[in-house]
UniProtKB/Swiss-Prot annotation:
<feature type="zinc finger region" description="C2H2-type 6">
    <location>
        <begin position="361"/>
        <end position="383"/>
    </location>
</feature>
<feature type="cross-link" description="Glycyl lysine isopeptide (Lys-Gly) (interchain with G-Cter in SUMO2)">
    <location>
        <position position="223"/>
    </location>
</feature>
<keyword id="KW-0677">Repeat</keyword>
<feature type="zinc finger region" description="C2H2-type 1; degenerate">
    <location>
        <begin position="217"/>
        <end position="241"/>
    </location>
</feature>
<keyword id="KW-0832">Ubl conjugation</keyword>
<dbReference type="InterPro" id="IPR050589">
    <property type="entry name" value="Ikaros_C2H2-ZF"/>
</dbReference>
<keyword id="KW-0863">Zinc-finger</keyword>
<dbReference type="GO" id="GO:0005634">
    <property type="term" value="C:nucleus"/>
</dbReference>
<feature type="zinc finger region" description="C2H2-type 2; degenerate">
    <location>
        <begin position="247"/>
        <end position="269"/>
    </location>
</feature>
<keyword id="KW-1017">Isopeptide bond</keyword>
<feature type="zinc finger region" description="C2H2-type 11">
    <location>
        <begin position="501"/>
        <end position="523"/>
    </location>
</feature>
<dbReference type="InterPro" id="IPR001909">
    <property type="entry name" value="KRAB"/>
</dbReference>
<keyword id="KW-0805">Transcription regulation</keyword>
<dbReference type="GO" id="GO:0006357">
    <property type="term" value="P:regulation of transcription by RNA polymerase II"/>
</dbReference>
<dbReference type="GO" id="GO:0008270">
    <property type="term" value="F:zinc ion binding"/>
</dbReference>
<feature type="zinc finger region" description="C2H2-type 14">
    <location>
        <begin position="585"/>
        <end position="607"/>
    </location>
</feature>
<keyword id="KW-0539">Nucleus</keyword>
Length: 640
């Protein structure tokens, strides 16, 4: 099929001087031209016809550039008027150009090219026209070469002389002369005939031929025998050999050698992970990573077993890396800071980003930048509110998978991180590291304003709010603001009256678990702090220190407004509300407000009728403690 033949066009031999050696005979353009029948031409689409036109024109120009030598070596090249659709003129022109000496195109070659150009320019719109007529038989032909072949068969000759064939073809040529000019696409010049344009274009052929020769050299130089369906794929593939990187990332200038690699790389700067594993649902940035995951995780045999924990791995390299978690080996050491790593990938990432300060992954919501792309992806869940990891026990959801794993230890009771000094165990490794600083005395977080140091970074951040006055955590019920979130949570229980931690000995309830533990020491007499002055015991050292101020008379907390002094800071804070007029405790029954919480509790007993203070002598009950004390004085005066 002709159409298929043109799509898979074989390489047309390059015409060089080897074709025109006298010992091998003369080669003309007609010898290497390709022809189609009327039916075959009708099967070609516009793109295929254009390709045919370009190939034939290139071969013609190449033949003209090296010289056809078809019996006219000593003659000068014909001009525009020499050969045309109208006939032969006697006008002559000099050689085609100074850059191509002795370059000629014989009349036969020009006529063949005119046939091809006529057909391709009309694009088969007039397929019934057959401008070549045989004088002997009266038959019509689409191409002059077909007419010549027919006449050879009629005469029994295999070859005819050039003079006879040229005259015959010229006399039988019925190509209508177009009124339009033929422009050169290389320079702004028009020609009245196709032949004039062809002769002019041979002046460009030497430079074009040299350029194509360089391209051919590069193709041979980097030849790797890979085959591609489209030219664009060949161009991108050649960049592998040349090292060219045509696609550049705007964010930080990374260059890549193909558009596909560029698109794949861009996914590292966003959250797109289009390749999803159909077995486990895990998604990946690149198709190659997905294929590797499926081969390694789901299909590949896990024949390497860790003798420490029994975990199976798919490769010996993975087993060696895994065993470092047991033996503590960290072979990759940073020569800048001395930090060591178990995995080479982590080590390389540390060197590339930590010491250079590079943070290429920027959150478009808040502008925060990150060293790794996965850190940015996890951070963006803060803005989207996505909590993909849910606890199957209590339904609580988390942003990070590690947070879920840590939370689940609350249900299982697992505390894998144990202190070697005191044996105390922790759920989180971070808590163990913070605890170990108690034994070492290390306090790495120092306030630059007052110099106070802290074991935990959270304590340091909370302390800084004292200097800045920031109270970021506000109560939604009463509008009171607090420095820390933990203090706000404690405060909320005032409104809800929630006391979830109850003592099993006396039934007393507490807001916090730590308060319950401190209280239980009273019953167990464990680690009680006893006052040397009066023998009173306390469950916590802090309470003992506050109590001892009663004996010493120390009142270190002074009011800046009135100069009144107090033993405890909490008492000073409560007192300062007298000056500010703040009354944060409101009665829900009568909307009366109070400065102190205990005053609100006492007031509410008026509405409830509760009288918890009962006299042991007469059984009379009171709603306030001082009312009971005042009543008991009556019984004292009655005694003899």
């Amino acid at each position: 099929m002709a159409a298929a033949a043109l799509v898979n066009t074989p390489q047309i031999p390059m015409v060089t001087e080897e074709f025109v050696k006298p010992s091998q005979g003369h080669v003309t353009f007609e010898d290497i031209a390709v022809y189609f029948s009327q039916e075959e031409w009708g099967l070609l689409d516009e793109a295929q016809r254009c390709l045919y036109h370009d190939v034939m024109l290139e071969n013609f120009l190449l033949m003209a550039s090296v010289g056809c030598l078809h019996g006219i070596e000593a003659e000068e090249a014909p001009s525009e008027q020499t050969i045309s659709a109208q006939g032969v003129s006697q006008a002559r022109t000099p050689k085609l150009g100074p850059s191509i000496p002795n370059a000629h195109s014989c009349e036969m070659c020009i006529l063949v090219m005119k046939d091809i150009l006529y057909l391709t320019e009309h694009q088969g719109t007039l397929p019934w026209q057959k401008p070549y007529t045989s004088v002997a038989s009266g038959k019509w032909f689409s191409f002059g070469s077909n007419l010549q072949q027919h006449q050879n068969q009629d005469s029994g000759e295999k070859h005819i002389r050039k003079e006879e064939s040229s005259a015959l073809l010229l006399n039988s040529c019925k190509i209508p002369l177009s009124d339009n000019l033929f422009p050169c696409k290389d320079v702004e010049k028009d020609f009245p005939t196709i032949l004039g344009l062809l002769q002019h274009q041979t002046t460009h052929s030497r430079e074009e031929y040299a350029h194509r020769s360089r391209e051919t050299f590069q193709q041979r130089r980097y030849k790797c025998e890979q085959v591609f369906n489209e030219k664009v794929h060949v161009t991108e593939h050649q960049r592998v050999h040349t090292g060219e990187k045509a696609y550049k990332r705007r964010e930080y200038g990374k260059s890549l050698n193909s558009k596909y690699s560029f698109v794949e790389h861009q996914r590292t700067h966003n959250t797109e992970k289009p390749y999803v594993c159909n077995v486990c649902g895990k998604s990946f940035l690149h198709k190659q990573t997905l294929v590797g995951h499926q081969q390694r995780i789901h299909t590949r045999e896990r024949s390497y077993v860790c003798i420490e924990c029994g975990k199976s791995l798919s490769s010996k390299y993975s087993l060696v890396e895994h065993q470092r978690t047991h033996n503590g080996e960290k072979p990759y050491v940073c020569n800048v800071c001395g930090k060591s790593f178990r995995h080479k990938q982590t080590f390389v990432g540390h060197q590339q980003r930590i010491h250079t300060g590079e943070r290429p992954y920027v959150c478009i919501e808040c502008g925060k930048s990150f060293i790794h792309s996965y850190d940015r992806i996890r951070h963006q869940r803060v803005h989207t509110g996505e909590r993909a990891y849910q606890c199957s026990e209590c339904g609580k959801s988390f942003i990070y998978k590690q947070s879920l794993l840590d939370h689940q230890r609350i249900h299982t009771g697992e505390r894998p991180y144990e202190c070697k000094e005191c044996g105390k165990a922790f759920i989180h490794k971070k808590r163990l590291l913070e605890h170990q600083r108690i034994h070492t005395g290390e306090k790495p977080y120092a306030c630059i304003i007052c110099g106070k140091s802290f074991i935990r970074s959270s304590d340091y951040m909370r302390h800084q709010r004292i200097h800045t006055g920031e109270r970021a955590y506000e109560c939604g019920d009463c509008g009171k603001a607090f420095i820390s979130k933990q203090t706000l949570i404690k405060h909320h229980k005032i409104h809800t009256r929630e006391r979830p931690y109850e003592c099993s000995e006396c039934g007393k309830g507490f807001y916090l678990e730590v308060k319950l533990l401190q209280h239980q020491r009273i019953h167990t007499r464990e680690k009680l702090c006893e006052c040397n002055e009066c023998g009173k015991v306390f469950s916590h050292q802090k309470r003992l220190l506050e109590h001892q101020k009663v004996h010493t008379g120390e009142k270190p907390c002074e009011c800046s407004e009135c100069g009144k002094c107090f033993r405890h800071r909490t008492s000073l804070v409560q007192h300062q509300k007298v000056h500010s007029g703040e009354r944060p405790y409101n009665c829900t029954a009568c909307e009366k407000a109070f400065i102190y919480k205990n005053k609100l509790v006492e007031h509410q007993r008026i509405h409830t009728g509760e009288k918890p203070y009962e006299c042991g002598k007469c059984g009379k009950a009171f709603n306030k403690r001082y009312s009971l004390v005042r009543h008991q004085k009556v019984h004292i005066t009655e005694e003899p």
